[in-house]
């Protein structure tokens, strides 16, 4: 799984670097760095709860497994939604604050476009890591990651030449 995830997460930058300018890569990278920090907050609980979820599956404690999974999804919603909305609404101010000026102002739109992935990554992390892996469905997770990488490749090939960093963010 980690190989597919690594390819999937680095594909945008590689394709952007091949198809556009260094400036576009820089703008995209600024938006992605903010997203990566926020994703670590959103997905942190899933990592912590994985051993407990696996234990509940092993002990056939379905009610507890459902309860802990629901709590993890609620946590993702509670954390990801406000962060996503905040950084979409205040993307320009956030970029200025984090970069110390207006040099990366063109990262604003890519940042706004990329922010919904906080919610999507959070939900898929709970569904994949917390629910499917303890249930022995690693292959399903791998197939979904490969499908995501192929979709990303196709969308990047279509959107990056015309939209640059914003196309990579979609």
Label every PLM stretch briefly:
Residues 1, 5, 9, 32, ...:
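Short runs within selected transmembrane alpha-helices of multi-pass transporters and secretion channels
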Residues 6-37, 55-56, 92-103, 162:
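Helix-terminus/linker motif at the lipid-water interface of multi-pass membrane proteins
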Residues 15, 49, 53, 90, ...:
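Hydrophobic side-chain positions within alpha-helical transmembrane segments
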Residues 17-18, 66, 79, 96, ...:
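A cross-family signal for key residues in well-ordered alpha-helices
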Residues 22-24, 70, 87-123:
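Interfacial segments at transmembrane-helix termini and the short loops linking adjacent helices
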Residues 23, 34, 62-71, 75, ...:
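Juxtamembrane/transmembrane-helix boundary motifs in multi-pass membrane proteins
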Residues 31, 35-74, 80, 128-134:
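Helix-loop junctions and terminal segments of transmembrane helices
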Residues 32, 68, 72-88, 103, ...:
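Short alpha-helical transmembrane segments in multi-pass integral membrane proteins
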């Amino acid at each position: 799984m980690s190989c597919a995830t690594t390819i999937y997460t680095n594909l945008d930058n590689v394709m952007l670097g091949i198809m556009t300018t260094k400036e576009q890569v820089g703008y995209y990278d600024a938006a992605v760095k903010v997203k990566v920090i926020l994703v670590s907050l959103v997905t942190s609980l899933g990592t912590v709860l994985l051993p407990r979820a696996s234990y509940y599956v092993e002990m056939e404690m379905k009610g507890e497994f459902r309860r802990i999974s629901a709590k993890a999804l609620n946590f993702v919603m509670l954390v990801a939604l406000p962060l996503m909305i905040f950084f979409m609404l205040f993307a320009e101010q956030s970029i200025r604050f984090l970069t110390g000026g207006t040099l990366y102002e063109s990262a604003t739109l890519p940042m706004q476009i990329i922010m919904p992935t906080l919610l999507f990554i959070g939900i898929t992390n709970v569904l994949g890591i917390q629910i499917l892996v303890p249930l022995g469905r690693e292959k399903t997770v791998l197939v979904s990651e490969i499908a995501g990488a192929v979709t990303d490749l196709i969308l990047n090939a279509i959107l990056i030449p015309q939209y640059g960093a914003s196309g990579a963010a979609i």
